[in-house]
Curated annotation (Swiss-Prot):
GO biological process, one term: translation
GO cellular component: cytosolic large ribosomal subunit
UniProt source species: Orientia tsutsugamushi (strain Ikeda) (Rickettsia tsutsugamushi)
Protein name: Large ribosomal subunit protein bL17
HAMAP family: Ribosomal_bL17 (MF_01368)
Stored InterPro entries: Ribosomal_bL17, Ribosomal_bL17_CS, Ribosomal_bL17_sf
NCBIfam families to which the protein is assigned, alphabetical: L17
Superkingdom, taxonomy of origin: Bacteria
Sorted UniProt keywords: Ribonucleoprotein, Ribosomal protein
A GO molecular-function descriptor: structural constituent of ribosome
Length: 145
C-alpha cells in the first residue's frame, strides 16, 4: 500500500533523483529561471524552498547543510549572500511554476520554474561574478605558493 508516501519517483533510483534535484537546483539558483517538465518542476519547488529557508538562518551549520545537499559552493554562496536577504521578509512561496505548453516530440507538459521577485536584467551575472572571484582567488593562491 502507498498510504502517505510523498514525492514522485520520476522513473529514477533514489540516488539519481537526488542528484537530478541537486543539479536542477544549482541551475535554478544560477539562472533564477529554468525550463523543465512539469512533474520535475513540481518536485523541485519544495526542495529549493527548503534550501532558501535554511539559507535565511545564515550560520555555519546552515552553510554546511546546503553544501551537503547541492554540492556547489558557488550556488551556496549566492543562496547565502543574494537570495536569503532578498526573501528575508517572505515566509515561504519563493518560487513560482508557470505552465509552458507541451514539448514537441513526446508531448510532455513543460513548465518554467522561477524565483518570485527575481531581477530580470541580471540573469546569471551574480553567479558569473562569484565564479570569476573564486577563480581569481585560486590563481592568486597558486602564484603565492
Amino acid at each position: 500500500m502507498r498510504h502517505r508516501v510523498s514525492g514522485r519517483k520520476l522513473n529514477r533510483t533514489t540516488s539519481h533523483l537526488l542528484a537530478m534535484l541537486a543539479n536542477m537546483s544549482v541551475s535554478l539558483i544560477q539562472h533564477e529561471q529554468i525550463n523543465t517538465t512539469l512533474p520535475k518542476a513540481k518536485e523541485l519547488r519544495p526542495f529549493v524552498e527548503k534550501l532558501i529557508t535554511v539559507a535565511k538562518k545564515g550560520n555555519l551549520n546552515a552553510r554546511r547543510y546546503l553544501i551537503s545537499k547541492i554540492k556547489n559552493e558557488l550556488a551556496v554562496e549566492k543562496l547565502m549572500t543574494t537570495l536569503a536577504p532578498r526573501y528575508a521578509e517572505r515566509h515561504g512561496g519563493y518560487i513560482r511554476i508557470l505552465k509552458a505548453g507541451f514539448r514537441y516530440g513526446d508531448m510532455a507538459p513543460m513548465a518554467y520554474i522561477e524565483f518570485v521577485d527575481r531581477n530580470i536584467e541580471s540573469k546569471g551575472k551574480e553567479f558569473k561574478a562569484l565564479k570569476n572571484d573564486s577563480r581569481n582567488a585560486k590563481l592568486i593562491a597558486e602564484q603565492s605558493n
